[in-house]
């Protein structure tokens, strides 16, 4: 199960106790915010994009939107979300639970500047009924991010 992969990954960083398993869906920003009792912007949504033959992940604030010119300037390609049937095989997590923890090898993770507006954010934890309460600094460390980018508006 993907939540087990996320838990094992977070354990390496001493953060596995932060996972919240929910009894309701957290598959969208709105559902996650309601389930976790926070404002939607604090949901650290994980977006999966095509990049060459593989994929990249970008975590952004729940209310942020991809800015196509910024994305192309940063990554050298047009922003194209992964097709639904490619997400789990490429990333290692199913849609609704995609997170930066325990992803398949070779998938770079980037954090968008929109997250810096918050002290605490809530990414998913590998399935569509989970979340993790992390400071932005903990998220940066635990996601093993390749870096910070500015690709949202």
What kind of feature is each model-predicted range?
Residues 1-153:
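Extended, low-hydrophobicity, polar/charged segments
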């Amino acid at each position: 199960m993907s939540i087990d992969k996320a838990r094992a990954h977070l354990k390496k960083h001493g953060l596995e106790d932060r996972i919240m398993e929910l009894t309701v869906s957290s598959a969208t920003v709105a559902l996650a915010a309601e389930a976790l009792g926070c404002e939607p912007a604090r949901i650290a949504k994980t977006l999966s994009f095509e990049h060459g033959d593989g994929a990249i992940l970008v975590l952004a604030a729940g209310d942020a939107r991809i800015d196509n010119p910024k994305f192309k300037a940063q990554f050298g390609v047009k922003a194209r979300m992964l097709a639904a049937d490619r997400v789990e095989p490429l990333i290692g997590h199913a849609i609704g639970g995609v997170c930066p923890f325990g992803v398949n090898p070779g998938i770079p993770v980037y954090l968008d500047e929109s997250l810096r507006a918050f002290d605490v954010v809530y990414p998913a934890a590998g399935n569509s009924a989970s979340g993790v309460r992390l400071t932005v600094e903990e998220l940066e460390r635990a996601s093993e991010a390749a870096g910070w980018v500015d690709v949202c508006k």
